[in-house]
A protein has these predicted regions:
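N-terminal Sec-pathway targeting helices
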Residues: 7-21
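Primarily the internal scaffold of c-type cytochrome electron-transfer domains
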Residues: 39-45, 52, 59, 67-144, ...
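Structural signature of tandem alpha-helical TPR/SEL1-like repeats
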Residues: 468-476, 499-512, 533-546, 567-580, ...
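Structural marker of alpha-solenoid helical repeat scaffolds
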Residues: 481-482, 516, 550-551, 584, ...
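Helix-start (N-cap) detector for alpha-helical repeat units in TPR-like alpha-solenoids
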Residues: 486-488, 521-522, 555-556, 589-590, ...
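Terminal, low-structured helical/coil segments at or just beyond the last alpha-helical repeat
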Residues: 737, 745-772
Length: 772
């Protein structure tokens, strides 16, 4: 046998595979499987709770309560949400206004220009130059600035995007990553806030406001996290006192008695203890940042809570077992949760109003004196038996300021009133840590002690406890028993099945959700993804077409529909729909990525490259777009830059088999064979059923003298794709290298009989040269 000649043949075949590596448009095949719908759901609005008929412009309150309104406007709640204004900015946008986030490789700069405020993001590109530059205008500010100010940008589709850098008041003010963003895979400029966020940071939006070019009711828009063009600015009087229209009308009527005027508004001071506490707890009781920490009743829309109504009719609070394990964890929304642990609270009738006047919050030394006096109203006779440090007060030891565990750049007062403070530095810097979903196990009902005896409450408990033992079965039983009209609980089951990878059940429960409300966009998206995952492409496409018919400007549905058309080879339709998606939202990364795929398929490489780069400008850590750009550059022979983008794809998604595969092919062409073997081995590990990866790895192993390992990989190819002629040829050559001619003959003869003419010719040549 002429071993050198066989080796030469093997080497040439390896280069042939690398040089002709075709672009694999990963997004077109995998996107539906990777999209995750939100785990938090919006409610449907029952007819009797139309907010616009009950609420008034908060300015109406000022007419009679001018002094109270003036002091309230200075409180944190009164300044909780506002339009951004360069004139009123407390931050320094000129000095120390950059954040280099090493974990994600992003650089952010805060800019003031022409009376407007912006956050600018950039990265260092392949050549060391600035790339992926995106600038978003700051349209709204969340937070009073007492502790922090976070920023929102209104996207073209009406969503409010939380920006990644926040200003923190500690240490005279500085910039750092927003809560939840100090992570490698942070959300950058594409995290749309949910209505639940707005619930506690602002007044209720007016349901008469049309949020989507006048075409949608508020509640259908909130399903998609789209907010009205006009929003309240700050938590107003009606969040604590209830809807004010009846009160204003009574006060404006000269015939109204004082009793009638008082009866038309809620005065929290006159409520019983629990109802009074609940007015504050609607926003200041969070048991844990781990989810689920609360569950709203399916028959209550997000903005339907009214002061004085039992909170349990609106939502229930839960405590994850994982949170119980860390009993002294302190979070930013923990005030009521920590207060309820205190002996002072448990052994008295104290409420939040015992210490706080929500209309007038003191600061500095005045605040200290005020709160110490509140303590002394019950503890004036206490005599300390130990020497106290100079200048210490009740608050110093019993309610110290602490750094919050979930928002690590904020220091707040711990409302857990206890005899001695923890023996550690409560202000020490903390690193942000975010728990994974798998870290959350069972949850138990925290508040109230017993839920209301209603189907809505029973279902809410079951929905929150889906991950408890037999939780899914319990929820499904209740849904079958009560048949609620709202779609959210059904979608909750569908999304839990998605976590398990049970796509047929995902489709079943998504359909049930849509039976309850046919325009429920999260269920449309969920159903479509499940149908594509189960190879029901035609039905999945129809589902998306029906969704687009209902929401013609929905860039998510349009992008998914374009993807569906591309999968089925309908490139003209795909391109048209994706252009609509880009028009609706120019910053949807996947739309640009898919348009790049279409341009690449048409041979328009310059357009393809432009779209792939635009996709990455919108979302730099998009693994698919990085991989697609890497493939395009690979084909053009721009190897070093191609390697840069393949590495970016793998960094974004280390389990992305095709990126490892493509990078391995490139490395083989670049003659970096050990690295190529490592990448292809990783690709095989992540995608063991892909015969092409096994074949490429086998070719590479054989070319580098690892015939035994190569034979194993060729054997795996033939298990996955029997009689595959190229694998038969490769295995035959490998067996010749191992001096196993009889076994080699079998595979070379099979290759010679295959339908691929070039493979057959080479197999016949080897048979003639070595075995005949």
């Amino acid at each position: 046998m002429k071993t050198r000649q066989a080796n030469s043949f093997r080497r040439s075949r390896l280069l042939w595979i690398g040089a002709l590596a075709a672009i694999v448009i990963a997004a077109a095949g995998a996107f539906f499987l990777e999209r995750k719908a939100s785990r938090t759901f919006r409610g449907v609005v029952p007819a009797p709770t139309a907010q616009s008929s009950d609420y008034v412009d908060p300015a109406e309150c000022t007419r009679c309560h001018r002094d109270v309104a003036a002091t309230y406007r200075k409180t944190g709640m009164g300044r909780s949400f506002s339009k951004a204004s360069a004139a009123s900015a407390v931050e320094d946008f000129a000095r120390a206004n950059t954040v280099d986030h090493r974990l994600s490789g992003m650089r952010y700069e805060m800019i003031k220009r022409n009376g407007e405020l912006f956050e600018r993001r950039s990265q260092r590109g392949f050549d060391g130059k600035e790339t992926n530059v995106m600038e978003e205008r700051i349209d709204y500010v969340i937070g009073s600035g007492n502790h922090a100010r976070t920023y929102l940008h209104r996207a073209a589709n009406g969503q409010l995007i939380e920006l990644p850098v926040t200003w923190y008041a500690e240490s005279k003010g500085y910039w750092a990553m927003s809560p939840g963003y100090d992570q490698k895979h942070q959300k950058d400029f594409f995290r749309a806030i949910k209505p639940e966020c707005m619930f506690c940071h602002n007044g209720y939006p007016n349901s008469d406001t049309k949020p989507d070019a006048g075409s949608l009711h508020l509640d259908a828009a909130l399903d998609r996290s789209i907010f009205p063009a006009q929003l309240p600015e700050g938590i107003d009087c009606q969040r604590c006192h209830g809807p004010g229209r009846a009160h204003v009308e009574a006060a404006s009527d000269s015939h109204s008695s004082a009793e009638r005027v008082r009866a038309t508004i809620v005065n929290p001071a006159r409520l019983g203890r629990e109802r009074q506490l609940e007015v504050c707890m609607q926003c200041h009781l969070e048991t844990s940042y781990l989810e689920p920490n609360e569950q709203r009743a399916f028959d209550r829309p997000i903005f339907s809570y009214r002061p004085g109504q039992p909170m349990a009719d609106y939502k229930l609070y839960f405590l994850p077992d994982a949170a119980n394990a860390t009993d002294d964890r302190f979070e930013i929304a923990h005030a009521a949760f920590r207060l309820r642990k205190s002996a002072c609270f448990r052994n008295s009738q104290m409420t939040c109003l015992t210490c706080h006047d929500p209309h007038d919050i003191p600061h500095g030394p005045e605040a200290t004196a005020h709160y110490v006096e509140a303590c002394l109203s019950c503890h004036r006779g206490v005599k300390h038996t130990v020497a106290l440090p100079a200048a210490s007060t009740c608050l110093t030891c019993h309610m110290p300021k602490r750094r919050t565990d979930d928002t690590v750049h904020v220091v707040m007062t711990d409302h857990f009133i206890r005899r001695t403070e923890p023996a550690r530095d409560l202000l020490a810097p903390l690193a942000e840590a975010v728990a994974l979903k798998r870290d959350v196990t069972n949850v138990t009902l925290y508040y109230p002690e017993k839920p209301p005896a209603t189907p809505a409450a029973e279902i809410a408990v079951a929905e929150a406890q889906m991950n408890n033992d037999h939780g899914m079965e319990r929820l499904q039983t209740l849904l079958e028993r009560y048949q609620p009209d709202a779609p959210e609980p059904y979608l909750a089951v569908a999304q839990e099945y998605e976590q398990e990878g049970n796509e047929p059940e995902v489709a079943k429960w998504s359909r049930l959700a849509l039976e309850k409300r046919g325009n429920f966009e999260p269920a449309i998206v969920q159903l479509a993804h499940a149908l594509f995952a189960t190879h029901q492409d035609a039905e999945g496409t129809r589902t998306l077409e029906e969704g687009v018919a209902q929401y013609p400007q929905d860039d998510l549905l349009l992008s998914d529909l374009g993807n569906a058309y591309l999968r089925s080879g309908e490139t003209a339709q795909a391109a048209a729909v994706l252009e609509r998606a880009v028009k609706a939202n120019p910053e949807r990364s996947e739309s640009h990525n898919l348009l790049g795929a279409i341009a690449r398929g048409r041979g328009n490489l310059s357009t393809a490259e432009r779209e792939f780069r635009e996709s990455l400008r919108c979302q730099p850590n998009d693994a698919d777009a990085n991989d697609n750009l890497g493939n395009l550059l690979f084909e053009r022979g721009v190897y070093n830059e191609a390697a840069f983008y393949f590495e970016k794809a793998i960094d974004a998604d280390p389990m992305f088999a095709q990126a490892h595969h493509h990078f391995g092919r490139l490395l083989a062409v670049m003659d970096q064979l050990p690295r190529a073997v490592a990448e292809l081995t990783e690709a095989v590990r992540e995608s063991p059923e892909d015969f092409q990866i096994h074949e490429d790895l086998a070719d590479l192993l054989a070319a580098t003298g690892h015939e035994g390992e190569a034979a194993v990989q060729y054997g795996r190819v033939l298990e996955l794709k029997p009689n595959h002629p190229q694998a038969q040829l490769g295995l035959g050559i490998t067996l010749l290298e191992q001096h196993r001619p009889d076994e080699a003959r079998q595979h070379l003869e099979a290759a010679a009989q295959g339908l691929d003419a070039e493979t057959a010719r080479r197999a016949n040549a080897l048979l003639a040269q070595h075995l005949r």
